Amino acid sequence: MSKRGRGGTSGAKFRISLGLPVGAVMNCADNTGAKNLFVIAVYGIKGR
C-alpha cells in the first residue's frame, strides 16, 4: 500500500521528468568553499 494516494484520478500515469538528475554537477555560489556540487540522490522519486 502506498503512503500517498492517487487523489481519485484514473487513466494513464504520466512520467514527470526530474529537475536535476542523479550525477548532475552544479556550480556553488555561496561562501562555503565548495566549487562544484554533485547530486548523489534524488529524494522522493520512486521508480524502477
UniProtKB/Swiss-Prot annotation:
Instruction: Mention any one GO cellular component term assigned to this protein in its UniProt record.
Output: cytosolic large ribosomal subunit
Gene3D superfamilies linked to this entry: Ribosomal protein L14
Which terms in the Gene Ontology molecular function aspect does this entry carry? large ribosomal subunit rRNA binding; structural constituent of ribosome
- Single GO BP term: translation
InterPro entries per UniProt: Ribosomal_uL14 (IPR000218), Ribosomal_uL14_sf (IPR036853)
Q: Which UniProt keywords apply?
A: Ribonucleoprotein, Ribosomal protein
State the family named in the UniProt similarity comment for this chain.
Answer: Belongs to the universal ribosomal protein uL14 family.
Q: What is this protein called?
A: Large ribosomal subunit protein uL14
Q: Which organism is it from?
A: Onchocerca volvulus
Taxonomic classification: Eukaryota, Metazoa, Ecdysozoa, Nematoda, Chromadorea
Q: Which gene encodes it?
A: RPL23
